[in-house]
From Swiss-Prot:
Function: Allows the formation of correctly charged Asn-tRNA(Asn) or Gln-tRNA(Gln) through the transamidation of misacylated Asp-tRNA(Asn) or Glu-tRNA(Gln) in organisms which lack either or both of asparaginyl-tRNA or glutaminyl-tRNA synthetases. The reaction takes place in the presence of glutamine and ATP through an activated phospho-Asp-tRNA(Asn) or phospho-Glu-tRNA(Gln).
SUPFAM superfamilies from the UniProt entry: GatB/YqeY motif, Glutamine synthetase/guanido kinase
InterPro entries cross-referenced by the UniProt entry: Asn/Gln-tRNA_amidoTrfase_suB/E (IPR017959), Asn/Gln-tRNA_Trfase_suB/E_cat (IPR006075), Asn/Gln_amidotransferase (IPR018027), Asn/Gln_tRNA_amidoTrase-B-like (IPR003789), GatB (IPR004413), GatB_C_1 (IPR042114), GatB_Yqey_C_2 (IPR023168), Gln-tRNA_amidoTrfase_suB_CS (IPR017958)
UniProt gene name: gatB
PANTHER family cross-referenced by the UniProt entry: GLUTAMYL-TRNA GLN AMIDOTRANSFERASE SUBUNIT B MITOCHONDRIAL AND PROKARYOTIC PET112-RELATED, GLUTAMYL-TRNA(GLN) AMIDOTRANSFERASE SUBUNIT B, MITOCHONDRIAL
Listed HAMAP family: GatB (MF_00121)
One GO term (biological process): glutaminyl-tRNAGln biosynthesis via transamidation
Top-rank lineage group of the source organism: Bacteria
Keywords from the named record: ATP-binding, Ligase, Nucleotide-binding, Protein biosynthesis
Gene3D superfamilies membership: 1.10.10.410, GatB domain, N-terminal subdomain
Stated name of the protein: Aspartyl/glutamyl-tRNA(Asn/Gln) amidotransferase subunit B
Record family assignment: Belongs to the GatB/GatE family. GatB subfamily.
GO molecular function, a single term: asparaginyl-tRNA synthase (glutamine-hydrolyzing) activity
Catalytic reactions of this protein: L-glutamyl-tRNA(Gln) + L-glutamine + ATP + H2O = L-glutaminyl-tRNA(Gln) + L-glutamate + ADP + phosphate + H(+); L-aspartyl-tRNA(Asn) + L-glutamine + ATP + H2O = L-asparaginyl-tRNA(Asn) + L-glutamate + ADP + phosphate + 2 H(+)
Organism: Methylocella silvestris (strain DSM 15510 / CIP 108128 / LMG 27833 / NCIMB 13906 / BL2)
C-alpha cells in the first residue's frame, strides 16, 4: 500500500515542490544464544575474537548448520508483521570481498526468502496513521568488524559479530517524510521487542537501518534512489533523510542527474557523503549455497509458533481502549513499550482492586514518565513500583490528598523514601488535605477580609477567582481540598 503525499509533506525547492520517497532495509539482530550457523556465543561486548568458531572464521572443511531458534524467530517476526510465511526458502551465497568477511561471501536469502509481503500500521501523529508495506524478510549472516583505531599502521579484524543471525526487513517505498520514517522504525522496533526476536538496541548495533531516499515532482515516476548505510539512531534517520533529500533537490535544480549510489551520513557535519556506486543484484553473483539444503517446514509448525505469540502492540492498544476506556493517544503511549504496558496493568489491578484506569494512565504518562526520561530509563525500569502508584492514585481518588500534594509525595518517593508506601508518607508528614468545611471557610474569610479591592475585581471579572484559590491554598500549605475552596469562594463572593 503506497501513501499519497499530503501538500504539507512536500518540500519546496527553488523551482517548485518535490516529494520524498523513502524505503528502508532494517537489519535486526536475532535474539539467540548462538549464531546462525555455529554454536558460538552472540554475547555483546566480549574481548575481540572471543566468540569465534571455526565456522565463523571460515576454516577449510567447516560446514554451516542452521540454528533452529533463529528460524523460529524469523517466522514469529513475519507473523507479527502480518506477512506471508514461506514454507520453503533457500539460502544463497552473496559474493563480495571485504576484510571482515572471512568466507569471501555472505550467506543470505535472495530469490526465496523465509517471509514474504506484509504490512505495518504506523501512527505518525495522534491524528494520522499510515500503512507501510513489507516487501520481504530474510535471514542472513552478519559480517565481522574492522578496527582502524587500535594501531597507527594497520587495521585489525574482530570476528565476534561474524555469523551472528540477522533478519533483513525490507519495506516498500511507502514513506513520504522523515517523520513517517522515524515512526515506522519506532513501531517496527516495538513489534520486535514484544515478540522477543530482537532487543532493538541501536546503540549496540542490534538494529541498523539502510535508508533509501529519492525525490520527484508530485505525480512523476520514482526518481533515482540513494542508499544511506548503517544509520544507527532514530534521530539520525530523520536527519539523514532531510539532508539527502535537500542534496538531491539541489542536484536536480542545478540541472544535474542524481547518481544511484551508497552514501554515508555524517551527523557531525550534517551531510551525506558518497561511499561507492550502488551495486545491483547481479554484481553479487548470487547462487544457492551448496552446503545448505532448502529450508522447509509445514503449516503446523507455523501455527504452533503463532499460538505462542504474545499480545502484540496493536491488539493491546485496542484492548486498553475497550477495557480501560483510555483515549487512543494514551493507549498508544503506554503500549509503545511492553514493560510499561505491563506496569500500567499491574498498577491498575494492584491488590485485586480496579482503580481509575485513566488516572493511573495520567500519572504514568505524565509525572512518572517525566522522571523516567530525566534519568534515561523507561517507567518500568525506575525504582517506583506499580503498587506505589496504585496507592498514590487511591489516595487521590478517596480525597485523602489532592493532585498537588500527590506530586509532593511522588517527589519524596523519588528522592528520599524510595521503598515507602505513599499512605505512610502522607500520615507521617501530615499531608492529608483539609476537607473540614469550617477550616476552609475560615481561611476564605481571612483572605477576603485582607483583600477588599480584589473582591470587587473578582465580582466584576470572575476569572480572578483563581487568584483567591491560590491564596487560600498558600495559607493552608497546599492541603485544602481545591474543589471545596472553589465552592466556598463562589458562595462568599457571589459569583
Amino acid at each position: 500500500m503506497t501513501t499519497r503525499a499530503k501538500p504539507s509533506k512536500l518540500i519546496k525547492g527553488a523551482t517548485g515542490d518535490f516529494e520524498i520517497v523513502i524505503g528502508m532495509e532494517i537489519h535486526a539482530q536475532v535474539t539467540s544464544r548462538s549464531k546462525l550457523f555455529s554454536g558460538a556465543s552472540t554475547e555483546f561486548g566480549g574481548e575481540p575474537n572471543a566468540h569465534v568458531s571455526l565456522v565463523d572464521a571460515a576454516m577449510p572443511g567447516m560446514l554451516p548448520v542452521i540454528n533452529q531458534e533463529c528460524v523460529a524467530q524469523a517466522v514469529r517476526t513475519g507473523l507479527g508483521l502480518e506477512a506471508q510465511i514461506n514454507l520453503r526458502s533457500v539460502f544463497d551465497r552473496k559474493n563480495y570481498f571485504y576484510p571482515d568477511l572471512p568466507q569471501g561471501y555472505q550467506i543470505s536469502q535472495y530469490k526465496s526468502p523465509i517471509v514474504g509481503e506484509g504490512v505495518v500500521a504506523v501512527d505518525v501523529s495522534p491524528t494520522e496513521q499510515i500503512k507501510v508495506g513489507i516487501e520481504r524478510l530474510h535471514l542472513e549472516q552478519d559480517a565481522g568488524k574492522s578496527l582502524h583505531d587500535q594501531s597507527a599502521t594497520e587495521s585489525l579484524v574482530d570476528l565476534n559479530r561474524s555469523g551472528v543471525a540477522l533478519m533483513e526487513i525490507v519495506s516498500k517505498p511507502d514513506m513520504r517524510s522523515s517523520d513517517e520514517a522515524r515512526a515506522y522504525v519506532t513501531k517496527l522496533r516495538t513489534i520486535l521487542r514484544y515478540i522477543g526476536s530482537c532487543d532493538g538496541n541501536m546503540e549496540q548495533g542490534s538494529l541498523r537501518a539502510d535508508v533509501n531516499v529519492s525525490v520527484r515532482r508530485p505525480g512523476e515516476p520514482l526518481g533515482t534512489r540513494c542508499e544511506i548505510k548503517n544509520v544507527n539512531s532514530i534521530r539520525f534517520i530523520g536527519q539523514a533523510i532531510e539532508v539527502e533529500a535537500r542534496r538531491q533537490i539541489g542536484v536536480i535544480e542545478d540541472g544535474g542527474v542524481v547518481q544511484q549510489e551508497t552514501r554515508l551520513f555524517d551527523p557531525g557535519r550534517g551531510e551525506t557523503r558518497s561511499m561507492r556506486s550502488k551495486e545491483e543484484a547481479h554484481d553479487y553473483r548470487y547462487f544457492p549455497d551448496p552446503d545448505l539444503l532448502p529450508l522447509e517446514f509445514d503449516q503446523a509448525y507455523v501455527d504452533g509458533l503463532k499460538a505462542g505469540l504474545p499480545e502484540l502492540p496493536d491488539a493491546k492498544k485496542e484492548r486498553f481502549i475497550a477495557e480501560y476506556g483510555l483515549p487512543a493517544y494514551d493507549a498508544g503511549v503506554l503500549v509503545a513499550d511492553k514493560e510499561t504496558a505491563d506496569y500500567y496493568e499491574a498498577a491498575v489491578r494492584h491488590g485485586g482492586a480496579k482503580r481509575d484506569p485513566k488516572l493511573v494512565a495520567n500519572w504514568l504518562t505524565g509525572d512518572v514518565a517525566a522522571y523516567a526520561n530525566s534519568v534515561g530509563l523507561s517507567v518500568a525500569q525506575t525504582h517506583i513500583k506499580p503498587g506505589q502508584i496504585a496507592s498514590l492514585v487511591d489516595l487521590i481518588a478517596d480525597g485523602t490528598i489532592s493532585g498537588k500534594i500527590a506530586k509532593d509525595v511522588l517527589s519524596i518517593l523519588i528522592a528520599e523514601e524510595k521503598d515507602a508506601d505513599p499512605k505512610d508518607i502522607v500520615e507521617a508528614r501530615g499531608l492529608r488535605q483539609v476537607t473540614d468545611t469550617g477550616a476552609i471557610a475560615a481561611a476564605v474569610d481571612a483572605i477576603i477580609k485582607a483583600n477588599p479591592d480584589k473582591v470587587a475585581q473578582a465580582q466584576a471579572k470572575p476569572s480572578m477567582l483563581g487568584w483567591f484559590v491560590g491564596q487560600v491554598m498558600k495559607q493552608t500549605g497546599g492541603k485544602a481540598n481545591p474543589q471545596a475552596v472553589n465552592d466556598e469562594l463562589k458562595a462568599k463572593l457571589g459569583i
